[in-house]
């Protein structure tokens, strides 16, 4: 059995194994535990024993908390599990890498479902709504990072009026650790992420310049508009964390922007997503970089001519635990290019 200490070591958190006494609120959970979660009051009567991680980020947080033996399934994996979590993940039943059915989840007799995205259990979900789980006595918890989108924008992915930050992720880790009565583990993970975030905050451009970034997730084809990280998205957070800013001004979470608009934005750095899926022609980073270097107009952009092109895990462009890993990937490559100290 994989212990929490061995999991910490595998994730590079071994320095936290010997942490001093955790904060006072990291003691045993008192049940029933009631939380306000994305506009819904959730009451947990006891620590879940048969949880499902519905969506990659939710599943990976549960695994990071060492809860694999309290999980009966996972579903909806846009990319492969973090390598350091592979052993723990192998102990949990994979329902499907795509969208499960409500019936397939209920077949595992779950008592709790951690959900990564509002669309998975929202009013327009084709799988199930939160109230459907409530009716059968299954508690749900939705990632706080994904439930703040405004409702007055037509973009199907919603928008953000303020820059996303890690506090929402820390809240998610803290609340999930309370739900499962492992608050000490939650505090250890949060402490690690905060230390890594603080280290990245020290990154500055070598010439003191405020670098501008475009984060390109994918495009259906070379002639199609690009899906890019919006101004206040996790991508915008990464740019800010590294002392720069997002060149995309749209508040939509995932705006589609034509290449004429990207050329006009004139970013100093283009970050291309690495995706495991093969849905679109430009999903793979190699295809993106080839397009950037061969398109007659795009190849003339200063960022392309200066080879200021870096590759990042596409999941890091979503507001997830991957975001900090992605920021570290970008920082390492920019330092190698001489753009960051």
Please place each PLM-identified region on the residue numbering.
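Bacterial Sec-exported substrate-binding components of ABC uptake systems
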Residues: 19-60, 162, 178-216, 335-341
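Alpha-helical, coiled-coil/dimerization segments enriched in small aliphatic residues
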Residues: 79-80, 227-254
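A short, structured surface patch at a secondary-structure boundary
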Residues: 53-123
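Extracytoplasmic ligand-binding site segments that recognize negatively charged/polar headgroups
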Residues: 119-128, 138-175, 206-234
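Short helix-initiation/N-cap motifs at beta->coil->alpha
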Residues: 35-39, 92-103, 251-259
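Bacterial N-terminal signal peptides that target proteins for export
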Residues: 1-11
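Structured C-terminal subdomain patch of bacterial secreted/periplasmic proteins
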Residues: 163-172, 271-341
């Amino acid at each position: 059995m994989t212990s929490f200490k061995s999991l910490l070591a595998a994730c590079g958190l071994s320095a936290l194994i010997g942490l001093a006494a955790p904060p006072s609120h990291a003691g045993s959970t008192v049940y029933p535990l009631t939380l306000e979660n994305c506009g819904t009051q959730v009451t947990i009567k006891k620590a879940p024993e048969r949880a499902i991680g519905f969506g990659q980020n939710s599943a990976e947080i549960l695994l990071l908390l060492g809860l694999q033996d309290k999980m009966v399934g996972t579903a909806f994996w846009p990319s492969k599990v973090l390598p350091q979590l592979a052993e723990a993940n192998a102990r949990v039943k994979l329902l499907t890498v795509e969208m499960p059915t409500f019936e397939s989840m209920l077949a595992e007799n779950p008592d709790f479902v951690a959900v990564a995205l509002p669309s998975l259990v929202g009013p327009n979900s084709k799988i199930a709504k939160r109230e459907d789980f409530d009716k059968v006595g299954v508690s749900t918890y939705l990632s706080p990072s994904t439930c703040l989108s405004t409702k007055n924008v037509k973009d199907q992915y919603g928008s953000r009026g303020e820059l996303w930050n890690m506090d929402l992720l820390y809240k998610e880790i803290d609340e999930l650790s309370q739900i499962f009565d492992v608050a000490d583990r939650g505090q250890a993970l949060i402490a690690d992420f905060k230390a890594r975030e603080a280290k990245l905050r020290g990154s500055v451009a070598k010439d003191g310049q405020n670098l501008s970034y475009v984060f390109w997730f994918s495009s259906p084809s070379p002639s199609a508009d690009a899906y890019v990280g919006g101004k206040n998205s996790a991508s915008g957070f990464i740019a800010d964390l590294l002392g720069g800013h997002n060149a995309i001004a749209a508040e939509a979470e995932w705006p589609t922007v034509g290449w004429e608009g990207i050329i006009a934005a004139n970013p100093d750095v283009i970050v291309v997503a690495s995706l495991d899926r093969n849905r679109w022609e430009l999903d793979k980073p190699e295809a993106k970089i080839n397009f950037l270097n061969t398109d007659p107009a795009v190849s003339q952009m200063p960022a392309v001519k200066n080879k200021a092109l870096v590759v990042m895990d596409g999941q890091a462009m979503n507001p997830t635990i991957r975001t900090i890993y992605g920021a570290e990937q970008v920082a390492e490559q920019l330092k190698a290019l001489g753009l960051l100290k």
